[in-house]
Amino acid sequence: MNPISLLFLALAMSTDAFAAALGKGASLHKPRFIEALRTGLIFGAIETITPVIGWGIGQVAARFAESWDHWIAFTLLLVLGLHMIYNGLKHDHEEEQEKPGSHSFWILAVTAFATSIDALAVGVGLAFVDVNIMVAALAIGLATTVMVTIGVMLGRVLGTMVGKRAEIVGGIVLIVVGTTILYEHLTAAA
């Protein structure tokens, strides 16, 4: 795989995470750069690991992973999105109990995993082409780290504009990302 193709692959793999990061940034109360970078590093690390795992799976059974990856991504993003919408609606009636401006590591990790399912599938495909999987995985992880960090900071602007409804917007973004993943895989299979 040539360097230009690898760059485009890395950027394409980071787009779902970028969209989710916009939602995360919108749901945070004025995230600081360090919070955005922390989120970017979590997403980037997971997005680095999943193509390597996919590549390993591809060495064994490519068709199996391809048949269920989009359903896992859709389900995880749907559940996380609905949870964020619920929390956004709940905040209208109840005082916020959590520390503003933070998301737990596990929420971020599950979201990152859900948005990296496509990278897992790409890793499966990379098992059948001439590519250094470690270079490809590091490129995908670096692009994701940068894109997510930027996405969280841009999401902050969105959060300021929509106020209390920011978490609802973030949940809707996750559901849209999950639905898009499902739609793209189902229409590609048809």
From Swiss-Prot:
Pfam family, one: Mntp
Alphabetized UniProt keyword annotations: Cell inner membrane, Cell membrane, Ion transport, Manganese, Membrane, Transmembrane, Transmembrane helix, Transport
InterPro entries: Mntp/YtaF, Put_MntP
Subcellular location(s) per record: Cell inner membrane
Family: Belongs to the MntP (TC 9.B.29) family.
Main localization category: membrane
Keyword Repeat: no
Signal peptide location: none
Source superkingdom: Bacteria
Record protein name field: Putative manganese efflux pump MntP
Membrane topology per record: Multi-pass membrane protein
UniProt xrefs under NCBIfam families: PRK11469.1 (NF008546)
Record-level Gene Ontology MF annotations: manganese ion transmembrane transporter activity
Protein purpose: Probably functions as a manganese efflux pump.
